[in-house]
Each structure stands twice: as structure tokens, then as C-alpha cells.
């Protein structure tokens, strides 16, 4: 729950809805519709273990968006190609490496056609040799798609490379924020230095 302020997505409040010229706490239906525009990729992948990579990417579009199976599969195959895993479409998560599972999780989130992607420490549980695979997918998304990404990471070089804005958090609060050049080259706060 937001403690203070209002978050907007597409110029509409995310957790509140307009009513009689004021913002009031949003109804469950309003929240559900707004949440469907946000994709989330977790640190631990959270793939459905009983489903193949392809099925992991088609379940939500079929169940939530009401897509026909064929349409959802076509979209999922395009996304698996984007993350370099078309050849793994029929594999279950237990047969995939950590980096491959994370790339399927990214494709699954993208299958919902989000406006915003939340990426929570998506490389922290990966072996160092596969971190690059996942970062390359994020680089590609950053360059080729008009997609806002909010990423929690300890990969400072990567954050500097792809970000247009960096927020440094300490004890749950924003300590300093600004363009990457400012945060990394000329931080204003002692803690950030």
C-alpha cells in the first residue's frame, strides 16, 4: 500500500480512482485492470513447474486477457525467440538452467503486453556465468521496445548503462535520485558517495 502520494500510469492514478473530482481508494475491478498493465519478474523465477516454457507464457494471456490459444501461442513463440529460447519451448522449468528460467519469466511477463516491467533482483540468484544472458535480454528490451522498466539491482555498471534515472535507496527510503551520470560521477549525498 502506498504511504504517501499517487502513482500514475498512462496519466491515470494506479491505486486510486477519480470520483466526483477527487481521488478515492480504487475498487477491486479498477485495480485489477490497472495491474494488468504491469509485468513483474521475480528474483526466484516463479515459473509453474508443471508447465512447459510455452505454457508458462500462454496461461495468463488466455485466462486473463481472453486470448485464443493459437494467438497466445504465436505471441509466446515470438517472445521466446526474443529471449533466445525457442528451442526450449517444450521444456519444463526443471530442465532449464537458472538463466534460461529467468528468460522464460521475462517472456511470460511480456506476454501480457505490459506498459511497465518491474524487475526485482533478476540476476542475484544466478550463477555469474549466466548473468550476462539475462542482462543481454534486458539490454535488448531497453533498446528495441518502448517499455518502462523499474529495476532493483546491485549490478551498478548495468544500471548506469541502461538507466535514464537512478534511485539510491537506503533503509527503504530514496536517499538520492537523478540521471546516472549524477548518481555515479557526482553524488550529492555522503551515503551515495
Predicted segments with their positions:
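Short coil-to-helix segment of the ABC ATPase nucleotide-binding domain corresponding to the Q-loop/switch region
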Residues: 51-59
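H-loop/switch region of ABC-family ATPase nucleotide-binding domains
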Residues: 153-154
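ABC ATPase "signature
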Residues: 177-178
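Conserved signature/switch motifs of ABC ATPase nucleotide-binding domains
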Residues: 91-94, 112
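Helical segment within the ABC ATPase nucleotide-binding domain
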Residues: 132-144
